[in-house]
């Protein structure tokens, strides 16, 4: 990752998370103690980031209602996390229109679970952001769709490009191999308490109507943790694989641009693609 992206990320981080990010710059460093960083301060930051207009989860509690006794609720949640008593409630599944008569299922967590997801995403982001490649633009601090388009446009006008391959991974978040994802995560995270917490967020039931179902794969769309987990997964199976193993074997220039589960690869000629 380039230094300007890390600087953008660091501007909104607590001093302790900055320390995590600094250690994470060493690719061989493994974190043995991270869970204690999900404290009341981290939970409150996650609360402040919540959109107050978002729908409530299965428990019917809104952000405004949860915030009426915020200090007490955060202290209680932190105690449950510290003692290992926190359990992720089933995620409410709703289907939203996608166009052409199709729908896309998303999951809505209760406020308390959103705070845990948000705190985990903030902490794991400090661990993995230094590792991510410049080709990745989705759901990263200081980067977005316009940055991806600008970078692609620069290559199209400044480099010899004769062929473009567009990739859209169908049902990506629903099809992620959880076992492989956790193996990727544990390469950097040795903290068993944090591992258990991530596991609780992955292996969670889905509430549809009055029934709760469980799946063996995927991460829930709508969870604030899912974009980061998706980036970790695709960093390994696409970004690193293509740039380190595939691109060096090709003749001519090739570039990868990825925004979440959508990607574009440019080639100097169709024959070399």
Specify the residue positions occupied by each region the protein language model found.
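Acidic, proline/serine/threonine- and glycine-rich low-complexity intrinsically disordered segments
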Residues: 5-6, 271
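Phosphate/adenylate-binding "loop-and-lid" substructures adjacent to NTP/NAD/dNTP-binding pockets
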Residues: 44-53, 58-103
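Short alpha-helical scaffolding segments that buttress acidic/His motifs in well-ordered protein cores
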Residues: 46-50, 119, 197-202
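Conserved polymerase palm-domain catalytic core
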Residues: 73, 80-95, 99, 131-273
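Conserved phosphate-binding loops in nucleotide/dinucleotide-binding enzymes
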Residues: 105-110
């Amino acid at each position: 990752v380039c230094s300007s992206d890390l600087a953008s990320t660091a501007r909104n981080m607590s001093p302790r998370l900055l320390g995590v990010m600094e250690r994470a710059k060493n690719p061989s460093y493994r974190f043995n103690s991270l869970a204690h960083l999900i404290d009341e301060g981290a939970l409150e930051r996650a609360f402040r980031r919540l959109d107050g207009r978002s729908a409530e989860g299965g428990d019917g509690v809104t952000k405004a209602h949860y915030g009426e006794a915020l200090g007490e609720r955060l202290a209680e949640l932190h105690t449950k996390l510290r003692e290992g008593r926190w359990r992720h409630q089933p995620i409410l599944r709703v289907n939203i229109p996608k166009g052409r008569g199709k729908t896309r299922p998303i999951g809505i967590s209760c406020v308390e679970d959103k705070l845990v997801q948000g705190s985990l995403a903030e902490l794991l982001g400090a661990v993995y952001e230094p590792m991510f490649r410049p080709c990745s633009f989705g759901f990263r601090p200081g980067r977005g769709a316009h940055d991806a388009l600008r970078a692609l446009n620069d290559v199209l006008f400044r480099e010899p490009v004769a062929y473009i391959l567009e990739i859209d991974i169908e049902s990506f978040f629903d099809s992620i191999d959880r076992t492989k994802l956790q193996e990727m995560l544990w390469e950097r995270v040795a903290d068993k308490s944090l591992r258990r917490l991530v596991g609780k967020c992955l292996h969670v039931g889905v509430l549809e109507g009055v029934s709760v179902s469980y799946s063996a794969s995927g991460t829930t769309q709508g969870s604030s943790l899912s974009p980061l987990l998706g980036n970790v997964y695709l960093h390994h199976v696409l970004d690193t694989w293509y740039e380190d193993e595939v691109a060096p074997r090709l003749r001519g220039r090739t570039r990868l641009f990825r925004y979440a589960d959508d990607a574009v690869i440019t080639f100097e000629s169709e024959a070399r693609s």
